[in-house]
């Protein structure tokens, strides 16, 4: 008999796995909050009007038995990630590094991974009802 699949978001496990791969404090805050809240883009309230307010965009569960999240980390010159202290504001023309997070739970088997996807340019950034909408080019 095959185990019954169950799909769950586990913020603590996700934060732990992210901390080993992404050193940006704001990324940790955003990712763990988004996982523990909802399927909508959620800015981090700890750093208002800063890089940390850039949301990630969780997608619905896929037919591949996984949950997928995208996050964007602001990039400086030469593709070096910007720290919160040096990237307080993000606007049109800013470069972002996009990551893909996948967490799969099937019965008692679990796996999580983060992989780099693309480096993209922010063509527009606007805020509505406290949430940022980012258009990439």
Curated annotation (Swiss-Prot):
Membrane topology, as annotated: Multi-pass membrane protein
Domain of life the protein comes from: Eukaryota
Gene Ontology cellular component list: membrane
Major location (coarse): membrane
Keywords: Membrane, Transmembrane, Transmembrane helix
Subcellular locations according to the entry: Membrane
Membrane-traversing stretches: 26-42, 52-69
Additional record remark: Almost completely overlaps MAK3.
Protein name: Putative uncharacterized membrane protein YPR050C
Organism: Saccharomyces cerevisiae (strain ATCC 204508 / S288c) (Baker's yeast)
Taxon lineage: Eukaryota, Fungi, Dikarya, Ascomycota, Saccharomycotina
């Amino acid at each position: 008999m095959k185990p019954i699949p169950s799909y769950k978001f586990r913020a603590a496990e996700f934060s732990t796995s992210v901390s080993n791969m992404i050193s940006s404090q704001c990324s940790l805050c955003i990712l763990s909050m988004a996982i523990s809240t909802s399927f909508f883009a959620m800015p981090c309230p700890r750093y208002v009007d800063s890089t940390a307010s850039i949301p990630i965009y969780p997608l619905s569960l896929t037919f591949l038995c996984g949950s997928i999240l995208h996050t964007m980390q602001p990039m400086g010159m030469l593709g070096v990630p910007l720290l919160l202290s040096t990237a307080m504001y993000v606007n049109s023309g800013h470069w972002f590094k996009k990551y893909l997070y996948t967490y799969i739970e099937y019965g008692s088997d679990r796996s999580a991974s983060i992989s780099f996807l693309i480096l993209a340019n922010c063509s527009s950034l606007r805020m509505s009802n406290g949430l940022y909408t980012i258009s990439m080019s």
